């Protein structure tokens, strides 16, 4: 936003990923959206307020978001806060669904509107630390539903083992085909993080905490049917999860009061 289940064989399933999939309410009435229709790149800032200045930070962020909206910025920014984890002090501010050329247009607006200066005057004094990332959605392996009713996002961040991307993608192809063949009703999105280590992120939107319940049918049951056998399902899941060195999971809550959404 600155101008610029068990710990056994089934942790080798998508315990780290799809078993974290919330048992969301049916989404058949929602329209499935291909992220490539508009763009699949997100701009993502992570900001930490200075110690003891959370209230001041939020007031300044609200002011700066209003300034950017009034100044006609082409990007729309959404703000999120973690609600689980060891660090609950940071804010994630992101703008989604862009093509790369959109960043040139936003940079041009930023220079003309002097957005850097406005940031430094309004929000900068209350920021202790900032990190910046891009995120590229893998639309071919995602099953996304747009809805204005999402409040929470469950995010699993997985660090890929060196040289494991090929095997991981083969497994993901099998899983995605089963998801589509079985008409799995739950939305999710895979995205590669640009900046830092080589991480694949799984984002699960939720309209309430109730939607964090396990899906029904379970992921394994769905894959067993879609891939033809329990052995094939377990093999694909093991191949997928075995491609990662570590994983982190957290839940974020939307903060529309600190965003520039329409």
Where are these regions (language model features)?
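Bacterial N-terminal signal peptides that target proteins for export
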Residues: 1-14
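Short S/T/G/P-rich N-terminal loop/turn motif that feeds into the first structured element of a domain
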Residues: 27-262
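Bacterial N-terminal signal peptides
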Residues: 11-23
